[in-house]
């Protein structure tokens, strides 16, 4: 039996692609739709689980938000619209949920993504910062060659509460010679005060929704 001929498509014209404002040339980008989402629509997709991980805690579960295709797209669109004109060079995501939203927003802006991880999780040479917890301390690391001196860096995570890890990430980026252009979170818990601590460092904070009384 004779094999079927493959189907080919040819295009003889030229493609004239111009990236949206704030997006670097040559990057694959999402179409940014500013104003498409609202904080209330995003907030309604976040599930609240009481008494988790311990009694008295209201846990804000973003897995329901990420499971909704429109909701997830609204999150990425909202971040991209906010930062597309802020001359961001690279996005840094904090382990672990910063690894979910950070790369998607990086693609939307046409920039790279750098992970910040707990000690011992990165294979090459690292720099580190130790920071205080409620009981004890912890260490976060980043590859020494991940950020070039002078690069404008956007720090991303899912939620800002006490601000300890985000402040340590700022220290780590500045230690590497980067400039922290801002911090971005899906959720802010303003009563805990972490976002204000970051602002007190002179760093802008952007969030999509907030939950009071947590």
Label the model's feature ranges:
Residues 1-17, 23-214:
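PRPP-associated nucleotide enzymes
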